[in-house]
Curated annotation (Swiss-Prot):
Family: Belongs to the PEPCase type 2 family.
Catalyzed reaction equations: oxaloacetate + phosphate = phosphoenolpyruvate + hydrogencarbonate
Gene Ontology terms: biological process: carbon fixation; oxaloacetate metabolic process; tricarboxylic acid cycle
NCBIfam families xrefs: PEPCase_arch
Protein name: Phosphoenolpyruvate carboxylase
Subunit structure: Homotetramer.
Enzyme Commission designation: 4.1.1.31
Gene this protein is translated from: ppcA
Species whose genome carries this gene: Saccharolobus islandicus (strain L.S.2.15 / Lassen #1) (Sulfolobus islandicus)
The protein's required cofactors: Mg(2+)
Protein function: Catalyzes the irreversible beta-carboxylation of phosphoenolpyruvate (PEP) to form oxaloacetate (OAA), a four-carbon dicarboxylic acid source for the tricarboxylic acid cycle.
A GO MF label: magnesium ion binding
Length: 511
């Protein structure tokens, strides 16, 4: 059995600080290859996700890793000891990137040939897994697996002319199959994930399966509580399915540093391990790696790598029904407020520092079936914008919990163990002065302000959260938030950008 990675380094551009080795503030090109090597060698991460979604991808990464760092990769075999996993564009959703999908798939046999030359015949398959984002059905991942088998691996048998086959020209193509990891991001897809996985299992018959649960995009689209509970439902469903099919499923969770995006940081990783029992692989995003002291980062990654994997909590039907009900109530409260704040979010997001060479890319919210009225930036910029205007998104929609009876509240608390801790961490950055300023700058309606105030009041009076600055850093952040809004109002944008950067440094994450 292969090693299942416990940590996966990603290229999410959520870091406030720029790492010392980067040639510029925007990490791109050769720097991303170096970053992949450092993730393995310096930080001890088991796996690197190589992202072809929403950016120009370097499909020669394996060649560069093996040729630039031969000593390391002779000792640590790529595909056996450490892993490189491609994140594809979803051709069903990202029409402009369909050919990037094809190009990335076509590069997999090249990596095989390179590894054969480097390691010797049959030693390793360096890239054998791909991640498909925004997966909503089993047909999508079945199509990806079959596309590779039929359109890539089997093309060596095509006859060109007069008995001459493709393999006579370019050699045989390996590997013959790849493993597809669905990245599930929509609320309904997360809550019905068993249908996606079981359908794929019946057709493809894999020996095991890795399933990637998004935690960040669902929070942006449906609210933080909906995202957490949807992941809990998904974990329960996956473990039940694993038992019934007698088939190993290894969940991955995509988590960032701030509470809204998962709260996995070098200072909070133990609580995240406690919260998401049953998860095998945790994403180590850029803020985790670059916004904290190196020794603390390396120690945290080592602890995650060596932590015990507890079984996921299996939900009874009545518990699952309650959690589903909460996600609906919460989202109904959360989404209209976000729609009203969309102009503010979009205006602020374009001023945040850029950390990756990514193409412009709207988030799922822009074409979400449940709230298709507005387009928003990607989750990192979304979160950074709301923190910067002094309204952490973790607080939005909270008062919907007032609809729960005592039994429902108990079920909620049992299934979101660190709810109060996450909320308190975010609430330190709430700025009371924001209301008047955002009303003045973006003409935010009294109704929206009143709804946010209800959420704030509920967090304070019912949950017992202390709002606003409670230490030097949070008070400084609140002051910077007011200064940012004032400078933005006066169109002094260079100062606005400076305050945004300073706040990100305090949070230890852009968003």
């Amino acid at each position: 059995m292969r090693i299942i990675p416990r940590t996966m380094s990603t290229q999410h551009p959520d870091n406030a600080k720029v790492p010392e080795w980067a040639k510029s503030e925007v990490i791109e090109g050769e720097d991303e290859v170096k970053e992949a090597f450092l993730a393995y060698s310096m930080y001890g991460v088991h796996e690197v996700m190589w992202d072809a979604e929403g950016k120009d991808v370097d499909t020669h990464v394996v060649r560069k890793l093996l040729s630039n760092y031969p000593d390391y990769f002779r000792e640590h075999i790529l595909g056996k000891d450490v892993f490189l996993t491609y994140r594809l564009p979803n051709p069903k959703v990202e029409g402009a990137d369909r050919k990037v999908f094809a190009e990335t798939m076509e590069s997999i046999p090249i990596t095989y040939d390179l590894a054969e030359k480097f390691y010797g015949n049959g030693i390793t398959v360096p890239v054998f897994e791909v991640i498909l984002p925004m997966t909503t059905s089993n047909l999508e991942i079945i199509s990806v697996a079959r596309y590779y088998e039929k359109a890539v691996a089997n093309e060596d048998e095509l006859e060109l002319y007069d008995g001459v086959k493709v393999k006579d020209l370019v050699g045989e193509i390996y590997p013959k199959v790849i493993e597809v990891i669905p990245l599930v991001e929509e609320r309904d897809s997360l809550q019905n994930i068993d249908n996606i996985v079981e359908g794929y299992y019946k057709v493809i018959k894999p020996k095991y399966m890795r399933v990637f649960l998004a935690r960040s995009d669902p929070a942006m689209n449906y609210g933080m509580i909906t995202a957490v509970l949807s992941v809990k439902i998904a974990l329960s469903e996956l473990y039940k399915l694993s038992e019934s099919l007698n088939f190993e499923i290894y969940p991955i969770i995509g988590v960032g540093s701030l509470p809204f995006r998962g709260h996995l940081s070098p200072e909070n990783y133990e609580k995240v391990l406690e919260e998401y029992k049953g998860v095998y692989t945790y994403t180590i995003q850029s803020a985790f790696k670059y916004d904290y002291d190196y020794d603390k980062v390396k120690s945290a990654i080592s602890s995650i790598n060596n932590s015990r994997i507890g079984p996921a909590k299996i939900l009874e039907k009545y518990e699952e029904d309650v959690l589903r009900k909460i996600t609906i109530l919460y989202t109904e409260r959360y989404q209209p407020i976000i729609e009203s704040l969309a102009n503010a979010i979009n205006d602020v997001s374009v001023l945040l520092p850029r950390r990756r060479a990514r193409k412009l890319h709207i988030g799922l919210f822009g074409y979400s079936r449940s709230a298709g009225k507005v387009s928003l930036p990607r989750a990192i910029s979304f979160v950074g914008s709301l923190y910067s205007i002094g309204i952490p998104p973790e607080l939005i929609g909270i008062s919907s919990l007032s609809n729960l009876d005592e039994k429902e509240w108990d079920i909620f608390k049992q299934n979101y163990v660190n709810f109060k801790h996450d909320l308190q961490t975010a609430a330190r950055f709430f700025n009371w002065e924001s209301f008047e300023l955002i009303k003045d700058i973006w003409k935010i309606s009294e109704d929206t302000i009143a709804k946010i105030k209800e959420d704030i009041d509920y967090a304070e009076s019912v949950i017992g959260i202390k709002l606003g600055g409670i230490d030097y850093d949070s008070r400084k952040h609140i002051l910077m938030s007011s200064l940012f809004l004032l400078s933005f109002k006066e169109k002094i944008l260079q100062e606005s950008k400076k305050y945004l950067y300073e706040m990100a440094l305090i949070r230890r994450s852009l968003g």
